Regions:
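Cytoplasmic/organellar membrane-interface segments at the starts of transmembrane helices
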Residues: 80, 210-212, 269-299
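Hydrophobic transmembrane alpha-helices and their helix-loop junctions in integral membrane proteins
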Residues: 1-275
Length: 299
């Protein structure tokens, strides 16, 4: 969408400006070498690190995205074909988190320490905000899009907690979230192909007409809400531990707000399962269950 282009273009320009400035600060001459960029950034006075922080952070916050720079994502996901949506949600948004951990944290460490509580606040507020919006969605794609924003908010908060357990949890959760969100998009695509709609008000009874698809939907949904024994649990558990171990004096408050988002996540996810898998609706009378090859692919 045009909004996606504008957000990405502006963020890219901000990141480019920051990197050019850092390269010019290298005492050994202009260089974009990674170690030289780190040395140049870490040696800058605090006031210069402050504005460099926001240039780099906004660029990566758009990619993740987190509140309040998230508005491009639901529209882009809703209007994109499924293969593109999978690439956006499973791969591209993870580059935002990777950029924060690999670039932002070591390049401007003083500014990160100063602004970390602010970013964590935005992240945990975004978890609750996106979860509340997901609850009122009727379009499956938009619901999954807001779900992804909530999950990225938790990852962002853990990244700026900057503890060892949070970093290990980030690696695990980025991988597992990529798998889970891709599976969710595949299920949504199958529903739309078979019954011609993503509107949950017109869906229902899938457990009777497509039991295998229902099983796949339930398993992926449980992983999405990080139920114990699913792949989503261990990473999310480590993210919460990392947030709790943060040096911030507000770490308990952050934990409580993020925990509320997890509860809301269970609400919108289980509501989605209830409205699509059970009940009775005309749209689910036609169509068919997933094939063996499709089921193997989902597995």
């Amino acid at each position: 969408t045009f909004k996606f282009f504008v957000y990405t273009f502006v963020g890219s320009l901000m990141l480019l400006a920051a990197l050019i400035y850092l390269s010019l600060q290298n005492p050994g001459g202009n260089s974009f070498a990674w170690q030289n960029i780190i040395r140049a950034g870490a040696s800058l006075p605090a006031d210069q690190q402050q504005w460099l922080f926001w240039l780099i952070f906004i660029a990566f916050a758009i990619k993740m995205p987190i509140f309040p720079l998230h508005t491009w994502q639901p529209d882009a996901y809703e209007q994109s074909p499924t293969p593109v949506t999978i690439i956006l949600s499973a791969l591209m948004v993870k580059m935002g988190i990777y950029g924060v951990v690999r670039w932002l944290l070591p390049v401007v460490p003083d500014a990160v320490a100063y602004w970390s509580d602010t970013v964590i606040t935005l992240s945990v507020v975004g978890i609750v905000y996106a979860s509340l919006l997901a609850i009122v969605q009727t379009d499956l794609k938009r619901l999954v899009a807001y779900s992804s924003i909530a999950h990225m908010g938790l990852m962002s908060a853990a990244a700026f907690a900057n503890t060892d357990v949070a970093m290990h949890g980030l690696v695990i959760q980025m991988f597992n979230h990529g798998i889970n969100i891709a599976g969710m998009w595949v299920i949504v695509s199958m529903v739309e192909q078979r019954w011609g709609t993503r509107d949950m008000r017109q869906l229902g009874g899938m457990a009777n007409t497509a039991p295998l698809m229902t099983i796949a939907l339930v398993i992926i949904s449980l992983a999405n809400i990080a139920l114990p024994l699913t792949n989503g649990f261990i990473g999310e558990f480590m993210l919460f531990n990392g947030l709790f171990a943060s040096a911030s004096p507000y770490h308990i408050t952050f934990m409580v707000i993020a925990g509320l988002g997890i509860i809301l996540g269970a609400v919108y996810t289980l509501n989605m399962v209830q409205r699509t898998a059970y009940g009775d609706a005309v749209a689910m009378k036609a169509g068919g269950d997933i094939t063996r090859n499709e089921y193997i692919g989902l597995a």
